[in-house]
Amino acid sequence: MPAELSPIDTAKFAAARRAVDLVQDGMKLGLGTGSTAAWMVRCLAERVREEGLRVQGVPTSTRTAELARALGIQVVTLDEAKWLDLTIDGADEFDADFNLIKGGGAALLQEKIVATASDRMVVIADAAKEVAHLGAFPLPVEVIPFGWQSTKMLIEETLEGMDVLGREVTLRLSGDAPLLTDEKNYILDLHLKRIGEPRQLGLALNQIAGVVENGLFIDICDTVVVGHGDGRVSLRDLQSGQAEEGCIDMDRARNIFADLGD
């Protein structure tokens, strides 16, 4: 166990810890996927253990489900929960309007389904994830394996008419083979550099035969919690205009630190 957290882990913990403060007893929660979301699951488990907090968690990936169960959080399916009070998840990028790119962890389909079945979505991130324009991070698109190369060609053709700076499309690999999502689909990464009209692009991509879902989350995120390497944390809510600043007790992080993976 490291004696001190790195600045990036400090930022992730700070955001996760503040977001978990929003959880109330009896809530049904969407549990995100990724390294920042893993911090959130551990912070939530700490409240369950120490406060007797009663929650049900709907995980957005197999690895999140495994972590939540191992830490004593009650895990249910979305069909069992039906509707969620709150989803907390990370993001690869977010802009001033809280539009997101997600899917770096290849869980974008379940993440979007869970987020849109929630009263509120809270994104947790370090400050580096905030951008003026989406697109520096590759945009993941989940596609059916059957005919994926034809789907790729159709995506490339669609990009010709879009307000983007790059148009390279690559198949995401795991070793020498295509990476498989939890639904056994492939991921195509779109290297766009800058996305001028995220809403237009998201709608166009989902019209292509073979595309299951894309990693643009538009009008889904309500609140962003941003952590910093010194333990400072800010919360911004899009609807209410609420903005607050604070600082997290980093001794709490050291007490629950473990190998989170991603």
From Swiss-Prot:
Domain of life: Bacteria
Gene Ontology CC annotation, any one: cytosol
Disulphide connectivity of cysteines: none
Active-site residues, Swiss-Prot/TrEMBL: E111
MF annotations from Gene Ontology: ribose-5-phosphate isomerase activity
BP terms from Gene Ontology: D-ribose metabolic process; pentose-phosphate shunt, non-oxidative branch
Keyword set includes Disulfide bond: no
E.C. no: 5.3.1.6
Reactions mediated catalytically: aldehydo-D-ribose 5-phosphate = D-ribulose 5-phosphate
Record has Isomerase as a keyword: yes
Binding site for substrate: T33, G34, S35, T36, D89, G90, A91, D92, K102, G103, G104, G105, K129
Database matches in Pfam families: Rib_5-P_isom_A
UniProt entry keywords in alphabetical sequence: Isomerase
Pathway as given in its UniProt record: Carbohydrate degradation; pentose phosphate pathway; D-ribose 5-phosphate from D-ribulose 5-phosphate (non-oxidative stage): step 1/1
Record field: transmembrane: none
Family according to the record: Belongs to the ribose 5-phosphate isomerase family.
Function, in words: Catalyzes the reversible conversion of ribose-5-phosphate to ribulose 5-phosphate.
Subunit structure: Homodimer.
Protein name, entry field: Ribose-5-phosphate isomerase A
Gene name of the encoded protein: rpiA
